[in-house]
Amino acid sequence: MQQKKEKWYEMLIKLEIDTENIKRNLEKIKEINQNVICVLKDDAYGLGIESILPVLINEGCSYFATAYIGEALKIKNIVKRDFPDKVGKISVMVLNYIEENELKKSVKNGIEITIFNFEQLEKYVRVLKNEERIKVHIKFNTGMNRLGFDENETRKLIEKIKVISNIDIMSIYSHISDVGNKKETEKQIARYERIVSIFDKNEVKYGVKHIQASPLLFKYRGKYNYDFARVGMAIYGMEPLSEKTGLYPVVKLLL
């Protein structure tokens, strides 16, 4: 008689998302800066854009940032499907590089793209030369030393932008590398303000300014408020600093 094989069982772990705590965290963020670009990169930090986006839209959020084009298109599709009255009122920016074959799709879907070096600028302009308008965010490296134009490239960048007829600059932004280092943070802010002033002196039109991510927002409160705060981890209850900020946990594991 054939023996029965042992069965192996998987232990299922459920992740519960507390949407009320997302709302509470948003309130804490908006106590410092009312205008928020909600970062939904990495599928809303692993919690799922499908689950998180409706909560944020229902709380009045209308500006979102993603790492990649696929996530941005997903947001646009959810808005069309579930929030038809919000079509044309929800803005989405992509923080990372977009491949050439996806650029036209991005523009046609109203997705805003980030420019952070000259090679990329020239490539995007060449591919999109026949598009009516290109909405771009310009990222500057003020000390993070990862992505972005350097301060000494600002005037050259402005010269190039001035001859591009179909470009709309949605924002000038940067990112602070270490908010715990007060001296370095102040240096980065000073660089950023010098860059912005060069745009202003050259009468280059742009939309908004943003440099606050979650750590800068909670470390210095409203000291470095610009037009928007660009917030990800704080929305999801992740502490942006070593000290407690009073954010509410958003996820709970159910065994």
Model regions and ranges:
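Active-site-proximal beta-alpha core segment in soluble small-molecule metabolic enzymes
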Residues: 9, 13-16, 34-208
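Positively charged, low-complexity intrinsically disordered leader regions
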Residues: 4-32
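Generic structural "secondary-structure junction" signal
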Residues: 17, 47, 146-151, 178, ...
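Generic structural motif
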Residues: 20, 118, 143, 214, ...
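Short aromatic-glycine motifs in intrinsically disordered, low-complexity regions
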Residues: 8-14, 156, 240-250
